[in-house]
Every structure is written in C-alpha cells, then in structure tokens.
C-alpha cells in the first residue's frame, strides 16, 4: 500500500482521506516515508482518488494544509517551555539598557542645574545617585528620577522571576551557575534546543562575540570566557588559570544543557560530581 497525504492507494484502488486541514497535517506527520520507493503524486491522482474535483480544488486544499502545518509549527515553537523565559531575559536586558541611559541623562541634566555637582559624585552607586537627584530636584527632572527608581524596582522583580523560571526550565544548568546566568546563557544561544546542541568550546565564549570577531579579524588574543565569567568560580579565579576554570565549567554546562532539554529534571548523580569538579577546578594548577 502506498500512502499519500490525500489518501491510500493499493492494488489500483484509492481511498481518499476524510478530515480537515489539521487532521491531514497530523496524518502527514505520522506517515512513514521510504524515499527509495516513494513516487510523488500529482493532482490527477488526487482527483482519481476522489479527494478533490479538479486541479483548482486540489491546489486550494493543498494550500490550506500548508497553512495549517505552518501554524502548527509556529504554535509548537512558541509553546516551548523556554519561549517565555527567552522573552523575559530579553526584556530584562532592555530594561537594564533603559535604566543606564536614563540615569546618565538625568545626571547630565542635574549637572547643568548644579555645576558644582562634579564627576566624583557619579562614582556613587546608581541607586543612590538617582535618589539624590529625585530628592533635590523639582519638576520634570524629579519625575524622571522617580520613574527610574520605579523601573529599577520592576527590574529587580523581573530578575527574581527570571531566576525562578530558569530553575524550572533549566534545572541542571541553573544548579551549576545560578538561574539568572543560566537564563542569559540560553537567551544568547537562542533557546534551549540551540544551547543543547552547542559544544563546550562554544558555550565557553558565548556572549563574547565582539572579542571573538576581533580575534578572528585582527588576531588579538582569543577570549577565554563570555557569559560564564559571571560565575563566581570563573571571575574569582586567578587570571593565569581563569581560562582552565572556564573550560571545566563550560564542559559541565554542555552536559547540563542536554540533560535539561532531553530530561527536563535535575539529575543529582550528575550535579554532585559536576559541582565538586567545578569547585576544585584550577586548584592543583594554582599550587
């Protein structure tokens, strides 16, 4: 028996498939295809099978099936458990950018009003600087500073949600490097599936695109780490062994990402020795 998207043919007889476009898509996805014996059908076969009345009808139904298949693919893509986390991380990054830009602009504006406000005050923490501007300014500048503070509160709340969501979507990766860093790593890769496909060497420099292209173009020293630099074991490591620590961490993260994608639950038998290896990475070389 030869099965096509519009019906089944056997011994010269054809039975048309009855169902809407979505049912046909499900049928297509379930059909086994043997390419060595498969013969592409034409519209005349579909007419002979009783599936459609003429070529125009065939093309119209084929178009409906293609649209239904595309819609299903889009739904599956955006219904993935990492889809919302991806948007949350990107929103968090945008909020960070907006806060930094507005804080700089507010400080410049305040300096115009108060020339004695020298740059040494700009070395203070941003939250203290913005609060000072809000308390000592009236009118629009004070309101802008207030909006920055509210945006900072929103940013803090969103960061907590991102971390909590990452613990659910990336349980193993989050256990190794923390929810927020794990989420940023996944977002930079483009999703959980792309992250799970990356080798350890790519994960190690993920987020260091500028430095990597500078290395390829101008032969500057290659980057030793990207986003994973935010992990305490990497940024606290001595400079001469930091690259080795980053390699160990990236190797464990490559495995963790695959476990997150294919299993979706924390794997203690992996996490315990992996965490121990990360904690001791570089110690022997440092002696």
Residue ranges and their predicted role:
Residues 89, 156-175, 187-194, 201-202, ...:
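Extended, structured, electrostatic nucleic-acid-contact surfaces
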Residues 187-261:
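Phosphate-backbone recognition surface of nucleic-acid-processing proteins
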Residues 245-287:
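Acidic, carboxylate-rich catalytic segments that either coordinate divalent cations
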Residues 1-18:
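N-terminal basic/disordered segments at the start of proteins
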Residues 38-155:
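Long, charge-rich intrinsically disordered scaffolds of nucleic-acid metabolism proteins
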């Amino acid at each position: 028996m030869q099965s096509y998207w519009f019906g089944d043919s056997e011994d010269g007889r054809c039975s048309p498939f009855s169902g809407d476009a979505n049912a046909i898509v499900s049928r297509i996805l379930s059909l086994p295809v043997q390419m060595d014996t498969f013969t592409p059908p034409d519209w005349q076969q579909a007419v002979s099978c009783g599936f459609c009345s003429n070529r125009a009808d065939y093309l119209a139904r084929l178009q409906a099936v293609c649209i239904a298949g595309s819609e299903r693919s889009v739904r599956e893509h955006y219904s993935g458990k990492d889809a919302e986390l991806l948007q949350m991380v990107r929103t968090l990054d945008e909020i960070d950018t907006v806060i930094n830009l507005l804080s700089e602009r507010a400080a410049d504006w305040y300096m115009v009003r108060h020339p004695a406000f020298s740059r040494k005050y700009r070395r203070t923490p941003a939250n203290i600087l913005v609060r000072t501007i809000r308390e000592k300014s009236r009118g629009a500048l004070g309101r802008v500073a207030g909006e920055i503070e509210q945006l900072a509160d929103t940013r803090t709340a969103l960061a907590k949600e991102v971390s909590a969501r990452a613990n659910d979507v990336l349980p193993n990766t989050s256990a190794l490097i923390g929810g927020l860093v794990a989420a940023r790593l996944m977002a930079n890769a483009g999703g959980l599936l792309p992250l799970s496909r990356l080798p350890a060497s790519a994960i190690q420099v993920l987020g260091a695109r500028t430095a990597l292209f500078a290395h390829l173009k101008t032969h500057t020293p290659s980057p030793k780490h990207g986003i994973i630099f935010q992990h305490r074991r990497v940024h606290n490591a001595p400079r001469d062994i930091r690259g080795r620590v980053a390699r160990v961490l990236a190797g464990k993260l490559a495995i963790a990402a695959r476990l997150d994608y294919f299993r979706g639950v924390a794997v203690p038998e992996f996490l315990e020795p992996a965490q121990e290896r990360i904690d001791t990475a570089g110690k022997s070389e440092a002696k």
